[in-house]
Structures are given as structure tokens and as C-alpha cells.
């Protein structure tokens, strides 16, 4: 096969891949099916090129397999999920056969394939799938920890997301030590994105979700604690809330409102923790978060935030009775 023929095949496949990705961004019920048709056609084209053509060609083949798997996983049924896992496995195996240090795109794509495989297993939820999903997330982190991954442009963000996936998974498990291991994963997610959350909204989203996991874990402990004892993780939880809401306010000042659902949850949780364990700081907590000068008028004036602040002020009233 000539290089001209390879280029022509890749050009045709690229058009199909872009079309399929556009379908996946749609909310129509049939969108994953339409996307799958595009990815299958692109895959059939790229399978015509000899596997030993080049490492980059293997990367392109794996991209087809992973996108195909993503479309199948979106369908959610048993059959498509099984097919998705098979497609993930084929793409992962293909990438593991090439020199990953040759191009930072290679380990990045492999880590994302392992992540999405883990998410598909987690969503399927059969017995043993949680263990398999955790192993897949761990494999993704192992790839990102290799020296050759150091050239990945968004490495810190990817590490944060992988640790966040582990935190979410572990927080839903009921095994001994699950909550402590979930807390550890959430803290590692925050360490990964430290100092970057005010620069990139995607990084901010990962950090805020990690704090959300920490608060959920803390809530479990608080539900078992007596009123006259302060659990060790109260300060950690309030720090997570305060830091997270400060980041939300920073993005609100720049006209980015995407974090409000997480912010409302963090605010409500923080108000309850302050009311129960540090009531002397609750009024200041409310004032800081209802200050439009440090966030935006749309944010502090939103119905959800107004209601959350009202609920928090009722906590002050009850405490002072």
C-alpha cells in the first residue's frame, strides 16, 4: 500500500470520526447509534492499513476503537456494554504494543481508554465490576506516572481526574476502609490540580468534584458523631468547602457560571457543619458567599443561592434560641 493510499484512507476516516464525535455531543436518543455507524465505517477503513505501518497508525486505529466503545457504552444495554468493553480491550492492547514514549499522544490516549473502560464497568455494576473498574483506573494512573507521560500537556488535570474516578468509586463501596481510601483518593486528586484550578475551568471542575466527594465522606462520619464531639475531619471538610467556594466565586467574576450546582451543595454542607461545630463562623461564611463584589450578582441572586442562604440563616436563629 502506497503512502498516498494511506493518506487517502486516513482522510476519509478522519471525516467519519469528526462526524461521529459531533453526533455524540447531541442529546438525541438515536445519537449514539448514528455515531457508532460513523466510527464503524472509520474503523473498517483503518483496518485496511497494515498494522505494522507505523506506531501513529496504531494510535489512529485505537482512537477508532475507543470512540466506538464510547458510543456503545452510551447506549447502556447489556449487549452494547459488552461490545464496548471488547472494543476498549482491543484498543488498549494495540497501544500497549507500540513505544509509548515516542509521542505524548500515545500514553494520553491509553490512559483515557483505560479510564473509560473503568467507567463502563462501573456503570454496568455486575458483581466484581467495581474491582475491575478500580483496577482499570489504577492502570490509567500507572501510565500517567511513567516518565514518558511527562510530556503530556494536561498531565496534572488527567491525574486529578483519574484520582477523582477512584474517589467516587470507593465512596460508593461498603467494604472496610472504603471511606478512608476514598478520602485518600480525593485528596490526591486535589494535590494533582493544586494551583491550577483558577486557570482552567476543566481543572476547576475536577477539583470541585473532589471536594464534593470529601464532603460526602465527611457527612457519613458526622451522621454517626455525637453533638458534643468534633470529628477529626471537620476542619478538613470546612477547608474543602471554603477553598471550593472561593474558586467558584473567582470563576463567577469572570462570567463562568458552570459550577453553580456543585457550589450550592458545598454551601449547604458548609453551613450545616459550621452551625453544628463552629457556629461563631457561620455568619461570616454566609456573608462571604453572598457578596456579589467577589463573585457575581447573578450567582448570589440565583433562587438556589438565595434559598441556601435563607436556610443557613435559620440555622443561626435556631442556635441562638
Where are these regions (language model features)?
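Residues within HEAT/ARM-like alpha-solenoid scaffolds
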Residues: 7, 11, 30, 34-37, ...
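Flexible inter-repeat linkers and adjacent short helices
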Residues: 1-49, 53, 58-59, 63-70, ...
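Flexible helix-coil transition and linker loops at the boundaries of alpha-helical arrays
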Residues: 1-9, 46-59, 77, 93-108, ...
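Conserved alpha-helical positions within TPR/SEL1-like repeat arrays
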Residues: 10-28, 56-74, 105-123, 157-171, ...
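Terminal, low-structured helical/coil segments at or just beyond the last alpha-helical repeat
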Residues: 281-284, 288-321
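Short coil/turn connectors between adjacent alpha-helices in alpha-solenoid helical repeat scaffolds
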Residues: 20-37, 70-86, 119-135, 151, ...
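Tetratricopeptide repeat
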Residues: 35, 41-42, 68, 84, ...
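Eukaryotic tandem repeat interaction scaffolds
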Residues: 156-172, 180-253, 259
Amino acid at each position: 500500500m502506497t503512502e498516498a493510499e494511506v493518506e487517502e484512507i486516513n482522510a476519509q476516516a478522519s471525516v467519519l470520526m469528526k462526524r461521529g464525535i459531533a453526533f455524540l455531543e447531541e442529546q438525541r436518543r438515536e445519537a449514539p447509534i448514528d455515531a457508532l455507524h460513523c466510527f464503524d465505517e472509520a474503523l473498517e477503513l483503518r483496518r485496511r492499513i497494515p498494522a505494522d505501518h507505523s506506531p501513529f497508525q496504531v494510535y489512529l486505529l485505537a482512537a477508532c476503537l475507543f470512540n466506538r466503545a464510547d458510543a456503545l457504552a452510551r447506549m447502556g444495554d447489556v449487549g452494547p456494554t459488552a461490545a464496548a468493553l471488547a472494543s476498549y480491550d482491543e484498543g488498549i492492547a494495540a497501544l500497549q504494543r507500540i513505544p509509548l514514549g515516542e509521542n505524548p499522544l500515545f500514553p494520553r490516549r491509553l490512559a483515557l481508554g483505560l479510564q473509560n473502560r473503568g467507567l463502563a464497568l462501573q456503570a454496568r455494576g455486575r458483581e466484581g465490576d467495581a474491582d475491575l473498574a478500580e483496577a482499570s483506573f489504577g492502570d490509567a494512573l500507572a501510565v500517567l506516572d511513567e516518565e514518558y507521560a511527562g510530556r503530556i500537556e494536561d498531565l496534572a488535570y488527567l491525574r486529578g481526574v483519574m484520582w477523582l474516578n477512584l474517589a467516587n468509586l470507593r465512596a460508593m463501596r461498603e467494604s472496610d476502609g472504603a471511606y478512608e481510601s476514598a478520602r485518600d483518593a480525593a485528596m490526591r486528586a486535589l494535590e494533582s490540580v493544586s494551583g491550577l484550578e483558577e486557570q482552567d475551568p476543566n481543572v476547576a471542575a475536577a477539583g470541585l468534584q473532589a471536594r464534593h466527594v470529601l464532603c460526602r465522606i465527611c457527612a457519613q462520619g458526622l451522621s454517626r458523631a455525637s453533638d458534643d464531639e468534633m470529628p477529626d475531619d471537620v476542619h478538613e471538610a470546612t477547608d474543602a468547602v471554603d477553598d471550593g467556594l472561593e474558586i467558584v466565586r473567582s470563576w463567577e467574576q469572570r462570567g463562568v457560571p458552570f459550577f453553580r450546582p456543585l457550589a450550592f451543595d458545598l454551601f449547604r454542607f458548609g453551613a450545616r457543619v459550621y452551625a453544628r461545630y463552629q457556629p461563631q463562623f457561620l455568619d461570616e461564611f454566609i456573608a462571604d458567599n453572598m457578596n456579589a463584589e467577589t463573585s457575581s450578582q447573578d450567582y448570589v441572586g440565583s433562587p438556589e443561592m438565595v434559598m441556601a442562604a435563607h436556610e443557613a440563616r435559620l440555622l443561626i436563629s435556631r442556635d441562638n434560641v
